[in-house]
């Protein structure tokens, strides 16, 4: 997971 990437925010 890249820094700053949030899979929870869509």
From Swiss-Prot:
The keyword Cytoplasm does not apply. One of its GO terms (molecular function) is toxin activity. Coiled coil: none annotated. It comes from the Eukaryota. Keywords: Amphibian defense peptide, G-protein coupled receptor impairing toxin, Hydroxylation, Secreted, Toxin, Vasoactive, Vasodilator. GO terms for cellular component: extracellular region. GO terms for biological process: defense response; vasodilation. It is found in: Secreted. Expressed by the skin glands. The modification 4-hydroxyproline is found at residue 2. Belongs to the bradykinin-related peptide family. Produces in vitro relaxation of rat arterial smooth muscle and constriction of intestinal smooth muscle. May target bradykinin receptors (BDKRB). This is [Val1,Hyp2,Thr6]-bradykinyl-Gln. It comes from Pithecopus hypochondrialis (Orange-legged leaf frog).
């Amino acid at each position: 997971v890249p820094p700053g990437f949030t899979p929870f925010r869509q």
